[in-house]
């Protein structure tokens, strides 16, 4: 398995570029992204293929995750990591939130598993009869948690999206596929919510040692198509309602309850040890933008405090006015102007305009970005020093008041 991934520093850099181009919008259209992508000097036909691969949802625009995919492909092509644009995205480059789209695309292109229907001559020893279609409120809530954690944008579930759940169950693969075929008579690549809940209910009973039913009630089968399902079947027998009594032991006393292990791995049941495959953009550095907002707010607050302090100083006696102290308001104003200049310079570097437009030397651009970053850090340190000066002014004001 490849250990490649998009590093955090790459995500940060891509966010800077994306946010400068998007103008506060969540997507980039073709014309907005063209200026950055064409700076790579790749051929137009290569860029078209990169765009098609990165546009995972096929809406003709790139959100931030898709933009990261496009930028990584471009850099790998420019740096020789890829000899040509791949025909499909490698798994490590697929964003976790869009894995279902890639899976659906592969299924539609011919990669969808076609499960052989297994005739119901169940010879497995030790299985019990008495499957009940009734879903208790506790079971239904658990099924809905699993459904919500795996559904795609259309609210549907693919067979492969529940692989981690299958691994946690004491259910043979052939029975899992039989249950899928039972709730999916049209052999569609995905099923809706009602069919998913029925599928999970069948797996639940099989996990507890009951035989999989051979047929689905006609009314229930119709509900898969009408998107309406009755979970309180009149034919339910209370003695067979799994989970309705206080006994929390399973049929064997050793197996975990259906879905508990899986939900714990997902973090739904209070644990967060589950780590899905693919590129995780959940820690996308939009914090940098928020850091700018916080910094500007702190600067504004500091400016207001400085103005208040200066007004207090102006109220002192004439003999204490001209004591040779520096004009901190002027210094603060100059520091803000310098910060705005450096931010504008950084923005020009991101957009490929200004000085960066004259050349395509990536190393030089990286050095410029690092230099600007160091200068911004210097301004932050300067801000800290000014805060110290403000505290000194406050102490002087308090001392002056105390001496009166």
UniProtKB/Swiss-Prot annotation:
Pfam families per the UniProt record, alphabetical: EH, End3
Keywords: Actin-binding, Calcium, Cell membrane, Coiled coil, Cytoplasm, Cytoskeleton, Endocytosis, Endosome, Membrane, Metal-binding, Repeat
CDD domains associated with the record: EH
Localization terms from the record: Cell membrane; Endosome membrane; Cytoplasm, Cytoskeleton, Actin patch
Binding site for Ca(2+): 55, 57, 59, 61, 66
Domain EF-hand residues, every copy: 42-77
Domain EH: 10-100, 139-227
Membrane topology of the entry: Peripheral membrane protein
Gene Ontology MF, one: actin binding
Ranges in coiled-coil conformation: 280-399
Gene Ontology terms: biological process: actin filament organization; DNA damage response; endocytosis; endosomal transport
Keyword S-adenosyl-L-methionine annotated: no
One cellular component term from this protein's GO annotations in UniProt: endosome membrane
InterPro entries assigned: EF-hand-dom_pair (IPR011992), EF_Hand_1_Ca_BS (IPR018247), EF_hand_dom (IPR002048), EH_dom (IPR000261), End3 (IPR025604)
Subunit structure: Component of the PAN1 actin cytoskeleton-regulatory complex.
Its job: Component of the PAN1 actin cytoskeleton-regulatory complex required for the internalization of endosomes during actin-coupled endocytosis. The complex links the site of endocytosis to the cell membrane-associated actin cytoskeleton. Mediates uptake of external molecules and vacuolar degradation of plasma membrane proteins. Plays a role in the proper organization of the cell membrane-associated actin cytoskeleton and promotes its destabilization.
Family in the record: Belongs to the END3 family.
UniProt protein name: Actin cytoskeleton-regulatory complex protein end3
Phylogenetic placement of the source organism: Eukaryota, Fungi, Dikarya, Ascomycota, Pezizomycotina
